[in-house]
Each structure stands twice: as structure tokens, then as C-alpha cells.
């Protein structure tokens, strides 16, 4: 069952299932979350992650995979 993503908003912290920081929400674009490029984890680029990875969104967006795995699989935005 997919998580309710309606509570996700700009500047929410995104963490992995291990509680480690992944990024900060810039915006949601359909079924994709765009992370800010100014975040310390971003390397100065926007990255995109699918909303399918969201486990919960209650003040913090928690993913269903550890931070390192999410960061190795995210897509850099053009």
C-alpha cells in the first residue's frame, strides 16, 4: 500500500529508513519528489526520487530504503 504523500511540502527533510539525511523537498512533480540543490547532500544539483519510495510523511519524509541506497539510486535532474 502506497504512503499518503499529500502531506509532503516544500522544505521537509527526507530521511532514509535508517534515519540518515537524504535531502530536502523542493517540490512534488507527479510521482516524483524533486530535492533541493542547496541541500548539503545534493552536491549542488537537484535530484529526483520516486514517491513510491515514501514510507511515511509526518513532519519528515521517511523512505522505505536506507539513505545510502536511496542516494545511489536517485536521478540527477537536468
Give the positions of each predicted feature.
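Peripheral interaction segments used for macromolecular assembly
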Residues: 1-78
Amino acid at each position: 500500500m502506497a504512503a499518503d504523500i499529500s502531506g509532503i511540502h516544500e522544505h521537509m527533510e527526507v530521511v532514509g529508513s535508517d534515519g540518515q539525511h537524504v535531502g530536502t523537498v523542493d517540490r512534488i512533480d507527479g510521482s516524483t519528489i524533486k530535492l533541493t540543490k542547496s541541500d548539503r547532500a545534493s552536491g549542488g544539483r537537484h535530484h529526483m526520487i520516486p514517491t513510491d519510495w515514501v514510507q511515511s510523511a509526518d513532519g519528515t519524509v521517511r523512505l522505505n530504503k536506507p539513505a545510502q541506497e536511496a542516494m545511489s539510486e536517485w536521478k540527477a535532474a537536468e
